[in-house]
Amino acid sequence: AMNVIITNSVFKNNQAGKYSSTMSGAVIRFQGKDGNFVVENSTFHNNAVNSNNGATAIGFDNGSNVKARLVNNTFYNNTTTGVPSGSVPNILIKGSSNTVAVANNTFYFDLREETDETESGADMMKDVYRRTSVVNIAETGDNALHFVNNVVVGLRSAVITPAATGRTIVCQNNYCVVLEPHGFVSELADGENGNVLSTARVANIGDPVVEDIDNLTAMLSSAGLVAELSDDNFVPYLAVEKTSPLVNAGANEYLVAEENIVPEFDVVGTTREDGYVDIGAYEYVDDDDPTGIAGNELSDELTVYVQAGNVVVENHTDAAFEVRLVQIDGRQVAAMKVQQTAVIDGSALPHGVLLVVANNGTSQITKKVIL
């Protein structure tokens, strides 16, 4: 078995050469059996694959019985330098009997970003035409995709598959604004299972024309995403506007093998509360309630910091705090009662972002540390 966890990472400006049988992802290629593969709280930005096939970001190639979990990631302007007849996905699922959970991710592409305004319509369409989808599932192998709480804006298409059988697809509470229903799967139908699917073209008969791209460009803002990546976090993300239809529109829970794949926290450490889960990697927090953001220093009750590789928790109140250390995906790694000061051995903790959740019976404080 092969087990891989990738967290709090940024993959930017990578380019893979011509597609071959040994390459399926421009950034990450996973090939294994009977293992677990996790990518969380990461951003894939401006990566490209020189191919008519493969994937612009992540490829599962010839593996089997792999359980994959992709959550709280941002896929931003990844593309292909090839000339595909359809679209090249950010995520490619091949192999057999793999179960892939894709939850609370943000997929964004500005179709005109690399085009020249002086180009003719035909030349511009050559640029636009070679754009990407979100996920492509191979037609054989009995793979399963659970696609939940994702926002897809500006890509050519969302979930595609060349076959109606030999795969399991479940789509729930996704918000998609795409060019066309290319390879459209019925599981992502607009209005079904909380899904929203808006397309700039009614059908994908013939090549897109300039008017189709104009329609999609006009639709880009409808999801209420801030178009530029935010830089106030180690991992860049696309923030959400207050009036966005993504706010509170996500599913609280979706179980795969009795495990909830909806992450407990968003990409910056904000707690997702039942009944108020947003779609996408980022959880909107109203300016009037900033204490929901992990890592804020607004409270004088508790101080959390890293010293000599250890996590130090200082309680500045008379009441004891019940303190939990939680990984960004919700897994608890330590718990204790803190009356005054506690020093947690960093060598016993996983590296990366940890959320320190403290509760004294009357208030809860969440802070973020990085080991």
Language-model regions: role of each:
Residues 2, 15-19, 26-31:
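Solenoidal tandem-repeat scaffolds enriched in leucines and small polar residues
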Residues 72, 104, 149, 243, ...:
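Residue-level recognition of short loop/turn positions
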Residues 2-12:
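Parallel beta-helix/beta-solenoid
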Residues 294-371:
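C-terminal outer-membrane/trafficking sorting elements
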